[in-house]
């Protein structure tokens, strides 16, 4: 047992400790930045100085530091999170590593993301579930391309809180002038980022522990908070509950003939018993009869809560549909603009069909055109015929059916989607909806002869499937 937990158990008892832990707020954050900026070492220092490391873990770190460490005589705290053999041998981070810890004020989930350019897709994956980005900068090297790239991706993925931690201050003699030079350079770069972002810039030394958990004695000229103080006090809970009610249906819960509910997680906003709702894309309406949870019925469900909704009317709702309040204005379209992060060696090519998964909805779509590709270094744009590995571009998409969706900045769950290769079933990209475009009309010219023949065959030999006549539908 680690010493922090021991102290709290001694003070509160087991019941008091569990109760206090249950009601703490949760912050998900990632560490990102360029290669060797000290991301893994910073997380190791956070865990070590907040007394979250077990004695056997610390002993293993001391032992491994002699064999594969990179910090000389000192224990290499990066080994606490760099667990893959290849990571330890090369002294780098490859995969996203998750660590969990808590203080008396808050619970944390940390995503330690890789700094190398070829692992940008791993960084984007880690950032997609986070509330805050800790962007590491080496005080000797200053702002690098990968610093800009990770800042841009974090901004693209809707993160509203950035902590820019200027690390390795011990290697520049804790120079205030060097800190202010890098701070001003980053603030100038950040003017190109979109949205209302809260940016905090602090000096730290992850190796020595200065200004990570405790202030230390070497940065007396800095009057701001330590990194842990910032993480404990940043307000993200309000943002999670803000916004209009969105409830993507994950599955229809039918345990017996007397119960039919719709299970899922509230993506944003809240819903109460008695609220008038509508299901999209059908537009059918009803009212909420019950909100069912594992612990029994509740009167109101907030964002982040997994529940089953039952309705007062038997309306047709299936997996992938979206439940919203009756007066909500939600776009339903098969034509959209989205920023895409491409994650595979084979480039994204316009015209090729991919499986698209938005919330619980799965459909098929293709890129009509790539409007532009972003230059990560200066955030400018240029034309592109295809999108390469780790490329980020604005693409115009056409889907095979209309889907209810939001802009990603308004609701990540209903505005974000993954792109899946139809042959290999591998996730090849991630998309963030920027704008819904005018719905495209599909005619008979868009349907192949094979699809029409297959539709006729199904209706003839499998009438109980109740398949619609495709040729008649497309004439309407």
UniProtKB/Swiss-Prot annotation:
Keyword field contains ATP-binding: yes
G5: annotated span: 205-207
A GO molecular function held by the record: ATP binding
InterPro entries: CysN_GTP-bd, CysN_II, CysN_NoDQ_III, G_TR_CS, GTP-eEF1A_C, P-loop_NTPase, Small_GTP-bd, SO4_adenylTrfase_lsu
Any Pfam family: GTP_EFTU
This protein's UniProt keywords: ATP-binding, GTP-binding, Nucleotide-binding, Nucleotidyltransferase, Transferase
Catalysed transformations (reactions): sulfate + ATP + H(+) = adenosine 5'-phosphosulfate + diphosphate
Region (G3): 112-115
Amino-acid positions noted as binding GTP in the UniProt annotation, renumbered to this chain: 33-40, 112-116, 167-170
UniProt domain tr-type G: residue ranges: 24-239
UniProt-listed Enzyme Commission number(s): 2.7.7.4
Region (G1): 33-40
Gene Ontology BP annotations: hydrogen sulfide biosynthetic process; sulfate assimilation
Chain segments carrying region G4: 167-170
Quaternary assembly: Heterodimer composed of CysD, the smaller subunit, and CysN.
PANTHER family linked to this entry: TRANSLATION FACTOR
Protein name, entry field: Sulfate adenylyltransferase subunit 1
Organism whose genome encodes this protein: Vibrio parahaemolyticus serotype O3:K6 (strain RIMD 2210633)
Gene (UniProt): cysN
């Amino acid at each position: 047992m680690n010493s922090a937990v021991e102290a709290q158990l001694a003070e509160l008892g087991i019941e008091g400790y569990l109760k206090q832990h249950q009601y703490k707020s949760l912050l998900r954050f990632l560490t990102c930045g360029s290669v060797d900026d000290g991301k893994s070492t910073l997380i190791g220092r956070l865990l070590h100085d907040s007394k979250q490391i077990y004695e056997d873990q610390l002993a293993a770190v001391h032992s491994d530091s002699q064999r594969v460490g990179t910090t000389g005589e000192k224990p290499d705290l990066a080994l606490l999170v760099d667990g893959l053999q290849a990571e330890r041998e090369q002294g780098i981070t490859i995969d996203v590593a998750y660590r969990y810890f808590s203080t008396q004020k808050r619970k944390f989930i940390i995503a330690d993301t890789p700094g190398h350019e070829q692992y940008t897709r791993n960084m984007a994956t880690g950032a997609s579930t986070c509330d805050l980005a800790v962007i590491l900068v080496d005080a000797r090297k200053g702002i690098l391309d990968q610093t800009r790239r990770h800042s841009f991706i974090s901004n693209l993925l809707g993160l509203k809180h950035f902590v820019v931690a200027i690390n390795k201050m011990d290697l520049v003699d804790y120079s205030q002038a060097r800190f202010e030079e890098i701070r001003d350079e980053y603030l100038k770069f950040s003017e190109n980022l979109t949205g209302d972002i809260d940016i905090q810039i602090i000096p730290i030394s992850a190796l020595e522990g200065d200004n990570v958990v405790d202030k230390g004695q070497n940065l007396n000229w800095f009057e701001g908070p330590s990194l842990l103080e910032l993480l404990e006090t940043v307000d993200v809970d309000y943002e999670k509950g803000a916004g209009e009610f969105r409830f993507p249906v994950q599955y229809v819960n039918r345990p017996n003939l007397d119960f039919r509910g719709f299970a899922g997680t509230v993506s944003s906003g809240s819903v109460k018993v008695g609220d008038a709702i509508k299901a999209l894309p059908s537009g059918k309406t009803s009212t909420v009869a019950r909100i069912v949870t594992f612990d029994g019925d509740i009167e109101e469900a907030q964002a982040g809560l997994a529940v089953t909704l039952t309705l007062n009317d038997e309306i047709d709702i299936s997996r992938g549909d979206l439940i919203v309040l009756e007066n909500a204005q939600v776009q339903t379209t098969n034509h959209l603009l989205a920023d895409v992060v491409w994650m595979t060696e084979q480039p994204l090519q316009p015209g090729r069909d991919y499986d698209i998964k938005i919330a619980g909805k799965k459909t098929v779509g293709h890129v009509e055109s790539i409007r532009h590709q972003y230059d990560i270094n200066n955030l400018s744009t240029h034309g592109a015929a295809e999108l390469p590995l780790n490329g980020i571009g604005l693409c115009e998409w056409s889907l095979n059916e209309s889907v209810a969706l939001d802009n990603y900045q308004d609701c990540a769950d209903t505005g974000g989607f993954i792109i899946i290769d139809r042959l290999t079933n591998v996730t090849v990209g991630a998309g963030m909806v920027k704008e819904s475009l005018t719905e495209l009309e599909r005619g008979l010219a868009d349907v192949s002869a094979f699809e029409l023949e297959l539709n006729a065959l199904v209706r003839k030999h499998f009438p109980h499937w109740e398949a619609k006549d495709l040729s008649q539908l497309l004439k309407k």
